[in-house]
Amino acid sequence: MDNYTYSELLKSLQNKCDNIALIIKPEKIKQELERIEKEQEDPNFWQDVLKARDTNKEKVRLNRLLETYQKMKNSLDESVELFELAQNDSDEVTLSLLYEEAPTLEHSVQKVEIEIMLSGENDASNAIITIQPGAGGTESQDWASILYRMYLRWAERKSFKSEILDYQDGEEAGIKGVAFIIKGENAYGYLKNENGVHRLVRISPFDANAKRHTSFASVQISPELDDDIDIEIDEKDVRYDYYRASGAGGQHVNKTESAVRITHFPTGIVVQCQNDRSQHKNKASALKMLKSKLYELELEKQQSSAKNEEKSEIGWGHQIRSYVLAPYQQVKDARSNIAYSNVEAILDGDIDAILEGVLIAKA
């Protein structure tokens, strides 16, 4: 990097910083935080528990956004000032340090951009994830299990919690399907764009001739809704099936029919849960999954972008990302059009760069 390149970078980042300020309006955030704090001083504030909870969540969000913005702006202002002084004094040591820290400065601006993008209605929610293998038997079932592990490792990296709702073992390897929740701040906001078909190309570990195989798996993401969000489900529109839990969904395979499957006739959505020994709890979890999927479907219709992928054949259409392990190694996202070479790390859950790249591309 040289003086001209760094100078252009600073101009670009300052322009982004100005645009961010126009969007988030830091002074208005400060005023809103003052208003919330005064409201919380009222002795009657906690009488309405739901309203108090929502107000407190908003306070935390605004505080975090303001703090992230201020930290970014301070770093940028300091870099601009240091750059001018170093140029005037021909201070090569300081200039070299500024060049080294340029990626960190860029990342701090991008972090605020991501915060802004994660301010949608349900972005702060937990994420319900369903993974289904495509055609291809063991190959696709193994690929589905690799994706499942990838998301679990991502959750671990972010210190998020996960909870299995339903798990069906594959016939020889992998899984026939899995549904689980990732619980953490902005989990849904980060993962919402993972909806779609994921494609794997590799030398098959199940082929004695070591041929290259292509496998597909479908990932569906929906927000975990708060209990106070009202989604009406007409009993005549659903069928409940009860069966014995099996597989890794719970190491304790029940002798009673505690697992629950719900079919919603109008949409064709099917959800199931077997993570608990209690049929009642499994039914409640399955209903929550169904409500979340119906809610997301309605939002998509309102936005005129319904993409009901659970009704589509899992194959070449609707692909969002390709993971190629042979003859070369590369992960490429169709939305951001960015290719990544650190395939092993990605499959081990290092997917933040991919998720953020898609958020920026779709902004």
UniProtKB/Swiss-Prot annotation:
SUPFAM superfamilies per record: Release factor (SSF75620)
**Do the record's keywords include Nucleotide-binding?**
no
N5-methylglutamine: residues carrying this PTM: Q251
Q: Name one GO cellular component term.
A: cytoplasm
Kindly list the GO molecular function terms attached to this UniProt entry: translation release factor activity, codon specific
Post-translational modification summary for this protein = Methylated by PrmC. Methylation increases the termination efficiency of RF2.
Q: Which SMART domains match?
A: PCRF
Localization per Swiss-Prot or TrEMBL: Cytoplasm
- What's in the keyword line of the UniProt record? Cytoplasm, Methylation, Protein biosynthesis
Q: What does this protein do?
A: Peptide chain release factor 2 directs the termination of translation in response to the peptide chain termination codons UGA and UAA.
The similarity annotation says: Belongs to the prokaryotic/mitochondrial release factor family.
| Name by which UniProt lists this protein | Peptide chain release factor 2
Native organism: Helicobacter pylori (strain J99 / ATCC 700824) (Campylobacter pylori J99)
